[in-house]
Amino acid sequence: MAFDGVVIANIVYDMNRLLTGGRIYKIYQPEADELLLVVKNNKETYRLLISAGASLPLIYFTTKTKANPMTAPNFCMLLRKYISNGRIIEITQPGMERIVEITIEHLNELGDTCRKKMVIEIMGKHSNIIFIDEKNMIIDSIKHISNQVSSVREVLPGRTYIAPPGKGKISLNDLSVEWMENTLLVKPVSVQKAVYGSISGISPVLANE
């Protein structure tokens, strides 16, 4: 299955249905690029696995358990500090991009209510899990990307979070008959290539279907 924007939209729908309003009970980091969130909601317990692996980035519910390191990695410890027992407020997908944003409400050291956001970018070798504050500042990420690695954007603690650059495609949510007649159907390529090249969230596999 191609992990495109359409597939992610369905996953986000299920995540909202099952997790919104729930409490983050446990946070694990079984692999260097992988998180497991255990969420309790409506008397049920859900296990959400998030992988930012370069070869197979995924986000899905699981019933399986994995061995965890004896000492939790720094990113895992930081998440536990901020959002253990935090409440999931909403889960969104910007446009039809391969991005999932989980908004979490928690109490700070003074007992004040704060919100943080976990941004999950499912983008092949560029996949990442980024933790940001209410001002869109990066607190930390599971992968640090310096300007020596990427000239497009840095992903480092203290930097402002900037979403991955778009490709100028239209969202599925914004399609119209007029746009299709004036843009899609006049392109000098196959319908499959026109769909994939013009509409965000569509993979080549889905465009072919």
Q: What residue spans do the PLM features occupy?
A:
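Short N-terminal secondary-structure initiator segments
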Residues: 1-6, 151-155
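A structured, charge-rich N-terminal accessory region that forms the first stable segment of a protein
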Residues: 3-67, 71
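Phosphate/anion-contacting hairpin/loop surfaces
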Residues: 42-209
